Design a protein with these regions (language model features):
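Canonical Rossmann dinucleotide-binding motif of NAD(H)/NADP(H)-dependent dehydrogenases/reductases
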Residues: 1-17
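N-terminal Rossmann-fold cofactor-binding loop
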Residues: 16-20, 41
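Rossmann-fold cofactor-recognition segment
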Residues: 30-45
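Conserved Rossmann-fold cofactor-binding substructure of NAD(P)-dependent oxidoreductases
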Residues: 41-59
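A glycine-rich helix->loop->beta "capping" turn
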Residues: 53-65, 71-77
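Catalytic loop of short-chain dehydrogenase/reductase
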Residues: 68-76, 83-84, 106-158, 165-178
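C-terminal helical subdomain
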Residues: 163, 179-230, 234
Length: 243
């Protein structure tokens, strides 16, 4: 819905799909999209492939990082790179895509209200030592997404970098019974990506339904932000470029 809103405002929109079959579904659902890039962002190779395709298309004004695995993951899944799939998709992918893509004017990272139950301790971020808990792993990843958004806002002060929670909405992840307003969740993504509203032209903030919200106190701790950037750089082999 965010894509449709942006297209309706005459913005040119590129979408992402995990594989070719899904890309065809996306093209049928949003035929006005400029392009669809394809790649499995659970792997470093797939993340790099997506970034390469995006950069080949030219400069983007805004990027919305909204790919994610939900809290219902029943077991730990290990990727080809030996990482937790939850961490790879929800945290490392937005980090590496941010580091590899030509910098846009705005970055939008999707978090969740569940981030407030998350932990920013990276000691066992891959869930190798702990018994798997999908809900906790998801909450942790969504807190790390806020840390990432705020770290980018601090490192790249000329860019607008924000995070948001769309709410518990009726998507494939949220399920059909989710009670929140899907339209408002999507509108907030589009608003942060493209609006000239002064309230949207800010950086290092967290939103819900276009309103600033409190975050987990750890999200503002610069040492935790830096630790996350260092950890992701170690895993991916690429540090976040200087501003």
């Amino acid at each position: 819905m965010a894509a449709e809103w942006l297209i309706g405002q005459r913005h040119r929109v590129t979408l992402h799909a995990r594989h070719a079959a899904r890309a065809e579904e996306v093209r049928r659902a949003v035929p006005e999209a400029e392009a669809v890039v394809i790649g499995d962002v659970s792997t470093l190779q797939g993340m790099r492939a997506v970034a390469e395709q995006v950069n080949a298309l030219g400069h983007f004004d805004a990027v919305i990082h909204n790919v994610g695995i939900g809290p219902g993951e029943p077991r730990r899944v290990e990727t080809a790179d030996g990482l937790s799939q939850m961490f790879a998709v929800n945290v490392l992918a937005p980090y590496l895509l941010t580091a590899l893509m030509a910098p846009p004017q705005r970055l939008v990272y999707l978090s969740s209200g569940m981030h407030r139950s998350g932990h920013a301790d990276l000691t066992d971020a891959q869930w190798r030592a702990r018994r798997w808990n999908g809900s906790q792993a998801y909450s942790d990843s969504k807190l790390l997404d806020v840390l990432l958004a705020f770290a980018v806002a601090r490192r790249w002060p000329r860019m607008l970098s924000n995070a948001l929670e769309p709410g518990w909405v009726a998507t494939r992840m949220g399920g059909p019974g989710a009670p929140d307003d899907l339209a408002l969740g999507s509108a907030t993504q589009a608003w942060l990506a493209a609006s000239d509203d002064p309230d949207a032209r800010v950086s290092g903030r967290y939103f819900y339904h276009q309103q600033p919200q409190r975050v987990h106190p750890d999200a503002h701790r610069e040492e935790l932000q830096d630790a996350l950037l260092d950890y992701c750089a170690q895993l991916s082999g690429l540090a976040l470029p200087a501003a």
